[in-house]
């Protein structure tokens, strides 16, 4: 019985350590160690991309897209296990931080870049 209890306790401790913890005041620039979390569930946020000369490279996966309305300024925050993306103009997404859900209202605007694409 004690072995089962300790096993369950160990699983819970492991789960908690892999989740984002604490409060994050609203920011357009989450820390480098949180980018993977925030950019996985809404990749259109501007802080997920390095844009130069009309092209944007994803900071996590090296995907390259044409710079357009797909890349948006986002404000992210975390409070009491609620994670929030605010895209402005009343567009926001709130989720339970420990049970995140992908959301991307701008996915139709994403234009992947290939070497033979023109930017016209």
From Swiss-Prot:
Pfam families per UniProt: v110
Key words of the record: Early protein, Glycoprotein, Signal
InterPro entries: ASFV_fam_110
Lineage: superkingdom: Viruses
Signal peptide: 1-28
Carbohydrate-modified residues: 62, 116
Conditions for induction: Expressed in the early phase of the viral replicative cycle.
Protein family (similarity comment): Belongs to the asfivirus MGF 110 family.
Biological role stated in the UniProt entry: Plays a role in virus cell tropism, and may be required for efficient virus replication in macrophages.
Protein name in the entry: Protein MGF 110-5L
Lineage summary: Viruses, Varidnaviria, Bamfordvirae, Nucleocytoviricota, Pokkesviricetes
């Amino acid at each position: 019985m004690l072995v089962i209890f300790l096993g369950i306790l160990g699983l819970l401790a492991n789960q908690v350590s892999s989740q984002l913890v604490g409060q994050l005041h609203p920011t357009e620039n989450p820390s480098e160690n949180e980018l993977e979390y925030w950019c996985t569930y809404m990749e259109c946020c501007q802080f997920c991309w390095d844009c130069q000369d009309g092209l944007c490279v994803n900071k996590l996966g090296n995907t390259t897209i044409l710079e357009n309305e797909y890349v948006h300024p986002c404000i992210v925050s975390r409070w009491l296990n609620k994670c929030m993306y605010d895209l402005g103009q009343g567009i926001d997404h709130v989720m339970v931080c420990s049970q995140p859900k992908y959301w991307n209202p701008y996915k139709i605007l994403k234009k992947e870049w290939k070497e033979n694409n023109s930017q016209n």
